[in-house]
Structure formats: C-alpha cells, structure tokens
C-alpha cells in the first residue's frame, strides 16, 4: 500500500515541475480517479488549472448537477455541452474498440478547444495502473490511454496517479478531504454508458442504460460492491400486458475486487434480484427482460465492452 502523505507531496511536486508556469486542463468525469487527479493538480498549481467537465450524453443520471455542486470551489470549472457531437461521431459504429477510440478522440478535441481558449499547454489525466496494464496488454483500450488520438495538440500529458490501484486512489481522495460521494463512489468507465451498450449507441439505448444503472447502484449499495452496473446487451421477446414485444435485454453485474485486475461476481439474494428486474422493466416499456451475470474476471472483464 502506498504511503499516502508521501505520495501526495511527490505527486504535487511532479505536477508543478512538469507544468511550471504554464497552464493545464484536466477532464472531470465525476469518478474518483479524475476527481482525485483534479484535486492534486489544483493544490499543485491552483488557478493555472482549468477543470473541464464534458457532458458527453453518456453519463450517469444526475452526473452534471453533481459535478457543479462538488467542484464549485474551483473558479476555473468549465462545463462543456457536447452531447450532440459525441452521438453524431458514434452514429453507426458497433465495434467496441472503435467506439472507445472515437470517444477518446472527441474528448481530446473538446479539451483542445478549451485549452486554446485558456492558453493551456498541458493535459492532466486520472490514468491509474490497471488502465495501463489493460491497454498495454491489448485487453481493451481506455479512453485516456489507448484511446488517445495519434496527434494531440498539447505539449505534454501529466498522469500523477499512473502507478496507483483503485483502493490507493480512494485513500488519496480521503486524505485530500474529498467528499464521500467522490472518494467512495463506484468506478465508472471514462467512455461512460457507451461501453455498457452492446453495438451502436442510440438515444433510446442510453435512456435504458442510464435508468437501469441508477436502479442497480441504488439497490446494491448495501452490498458494498467494488462495482455494480447494468448493460444493454441486445433484444429478446417479452410480454407487456397482452402483447408480445421485442424489447431490450438488460444485464446486471455486481463484483467484488481489490483493484479491478481480478474480480468475483457477488451472490445476491433472490428478493434483491427480483426488485431490480421489476424496477428496470417497469421504468422503460421497451425492456423485455433482465438477467444477472455470474461470470468472474477472468474469464470476463468487468465492463461489457
């Protein structure tokens, strides 16, 4: 386990040394990784940092409002409304890796726009060790690692937490006095709900995935999973009222893990499973069935794409 106080001082020194008297931007997603990296960078360089939250349209329910409230102490916070641009770029794309690359590239382009406006030279990211391992091992790319476009209009990228595991990031977040909603929050992928949708990302699938993930996080909070999620994985026949429907299949997944490198599917009681399926199928008329994923990692990854 990392020595938290020592790490914080070293990370702030690294950030300050790399960026010097120039300006930097950092992307905020609301997750613990990017939030902790932002807090570190803000302590290191203060107003030289512009925190950028890009509303991709791929975020969790209520995410944007939470960002506004949590980071209102940062005068430089910028919220970019980019939902239409992301959905336009993703239209028709079904390949998981291409989706990640499209999202990664669009993220960088959004950052570049803000960076030009504030005359920033550096990009700070919340990349952690498991991100690098999965990307280097070609398990899958991460939007802030393998998903980066080949040409980036920044002088450099600073990744102060690149050697930390998720539980160590949480320790750092607590030491920085970040709110519990940030430090204890379940992991959420950088590409957002796009990797919880098999195939093309559409507004209808996003609406289903967003509400289903909200239900799952609420219902499973007492189980204290390392990560819990819902994914739209395809279509199947169901019955609504007296009519047959060909509706969406939602897969629920809840795992225990220390660092995300390996994970075990949680055993959930029947009443909890039934309550989730009732809420999810009741929230959207086009959801035909809900299934529970019992696969560990390996052989599966935690996310579906």
UniProtKB/Swiss-Prot annotation:
Give the metabolic or biological pathway. Answer: Purine metabolism; GMP biosynthesis; GMP from XMP (L-Gln route): step 1/1
In the Enzyme Commission scheme, what number(s) does this protein have?
6.3.5.2
Q: Which Pfam families match?
A: GMP_synt_C (PF00958), NAD_synthase (PF02540)
Q: Does the keyword Metal-binding apply?
A: no
Which enzyme type, at the first EC level? Answer: ligase
Disulfide bridge positions per record: none
The record's listing under Gene3D superfamilies reads: 3.30.300.10, HUPs
Q: Which GO terms describe its cellular component?
A: cytosol
* Keywords assigned: ATP-binding, GMP biosynthesis, Ligase, Nucleotide-binding, Purine biosynthesis
Give me the reactions it catalyses.
Answer: XMP + L-glutamine + ATP + H2O = GMP + L-glutamate + AMP + diphosphate + 2 H(+)
Work out whether the entry's keyword set contains Ligase.
yes
GO MF terms here are:
ATP binding; GMP synthase activity
Amino acids binding ATP:
29-35
What the entry lists under InterPro entries is as follows: GMP_synth_C (IPR001674), GMP_synthase_B (IPR026598), GMPS_ATP_PPase_dom (IPR025777), NAD/GMP_synthase (IPR022310), Rossmann-like_a/b/a_fold (IPR014729)
Domain (GMPS ATP-PPase): residue spans on this chain: 2-185
Whom does it interact with, and what assembly results?
A: Heterodimer composed of a glutamine amidotransferase subunit (A) and a GMP-binding subunit (B).
**Annotated function:** Catalyzes the synthesis of GMP from XMP.
- PANTHER family attached here? GMP SYNTHASE [GLUTAMINE-HYDROLYZING], GMP SYNTHASE-RELATED
Q: What is this protein called?
A: GMP synthase [glutamine-hydrolyzing] subunit B
What gene name does this entry carry?
guaAB
